[in-house]
From Swiss-Prot:
It catalyses: 2 a ubiquinol + O2(in) + 4 H(+)(in) = 2 a ubiquinone + 2 H2O(in) + 4 H(+)(out). The lineage of its organism: Bacteria, Pseudomonadati, Pseudomonadota, Gammaproteobacteria, Enterobacterales. GO terms for molecular function: oxidoreductase activity, acting on diphenols and related substances as donors. Pfam families: YbgT_YccB. This is Cytochrome bd-I ubiquinol oxidase subunit X. Belongs to the cytochrome ubiquinol oxidase subunit X family. InterPro entries: Cyd_oper_YbgT, YbgT_YccB. The keyword Hydrolase does not apply. Required for correct functioning of cytochrome bd-I oxidase. This protein and AppX may have some functional overlap. The chain crosses the membrane at residues 4-24. Induction: Constitutively expressed during aerobic growth, induced in low oxygen, and maybe by SDS/EDTA (envelope stress) (at protein level). It comes from Escherichia coli (strain K12). It comes from the Bacteria.
Length: 37
């Protein structure tokens, strides 16, 4: 049953990375938008 934990951990790590990348991109775009005003 070790493979279940391995797959779960891998998916969790990948999803965390994607969410972090999207959050950073959102913050950067927000800063860029404020500079234009």
């Amino acid at each position: 049953m070790w493979y279940f934990a391995w797959i779960l951990g891998t998916l969790l790590a990948c999803s965390f990375g994607v969410i972090t990348a999207l959050a950073l991109e959102h913050v950067e775009s927000g800063k860029a938008g404020q500079e234009d005003i």
